Amino acid sequence: MTTPVIYDISIGKHKPHSGTQTSCPFCHRETLTDILDEKGDIIWLMNKYPVFRNTYPTVIIESAVHETDLTEYTKEKARQVISFGLEKWNLLERDPRFRSVIYFRNYGPESGGSQRH
């Protein structure tokens, strides 16, 4: 039997949005909580506002540089980010607690994310 992934729309009411804050929470490393791993300026942490119920939602902050994207990275930085993400994906894939793992990038105003970094 499969278990559906349930999107909890009520979480969106509590999430801070980029347009309503004076500073980016991802730019202040010292205030981040629930950090799972770090490599250089790449950080893997628990999502503070998980919109999918009964999941293990994490976030990867790819760079300390605000408002940059994969297309702007050097080849080496892009390799580091992709390798780090795949390493974490594989780690969760091997974990017997999970039946499946979804890895997606959520960036830009059309992505549905509430924080731009």
Which residues does each PLM region occupy?
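Active-site microenvironments that recognize anionic phosphate/pyrophosphate groups
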Residues: 1-116
